[in-house]
């Protein structure tokens, strides 16, 4: 689905894996944009957790509309600090937000926002269908489990802030690690687990 590439830094203009040089968190304060970069040095790009955090902050401070479109700098009051990082390309009019200027220019572009919207749609629609098919609403969920090594780096406030997960489950999100690896090891070591997996596979619909 669309979620993997966008949230792992692919299809993002300056996306990269979660390694040294990747922006992993973004905070917008009155004095400007503050970045958390893996390794502590200057940013070389942005990884999945960084793009989610950035979008959540842009929504919170009013630079990004709920539709996913950037506001135009001309619509902001004179002297507004947000004009310092909200940019418009003079050639085609496209808008972006500058996270870092030197030594490497790192932006969040309108296209990046669209990629994350596709990811959000893929995940959220699956959640909504599961809830509807079982007669549930988000407030009735006891727990939401986030699997995978990458998933453990996604903060609850970012997942709910951009709408990937419903706001009602923010305090019920738990991280369960690399369940694919755990399941593979269990299947190799236990015939009973393999039989259980085969039985479950026959019951699962899609």
Predicted regions and their residues:
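Glycine-rich phosphate-binding loop of actin/hexokinase-like ATP-binding domains
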Residues: 1-50, 155-177
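Non-transmembrane, aqueous-exposed alpha-helical and coiled segments at domain scale
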Residues: 23-31, 127, 134-139, 181, ...
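Conserved phosphate/anionic-ligand binding catalytic regions in large, soluble enzymes, centered on
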Residues: 43-64, 147, 152
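A contiguous, well-structured pocket-lining segment that forms one wall/lid of small-molecule binding clefts
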Residues: 59-134
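Glycine-rich and small/hydrophobic secondary-structure elements
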Residues: 110-119, 164-186
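Hydrophobic alpha/beta core scaffold segments
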Residues: 124-138, 154, 162-168
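Glycine-rich phosphate-binding loops at beta-strand->alpha-helix junctions
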Residues: 138-157
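Acidic, glycine/GT-rich loop-and beta-edge segments that sit at the periphery of enzyme/chaperone cores
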Residues: 186-206
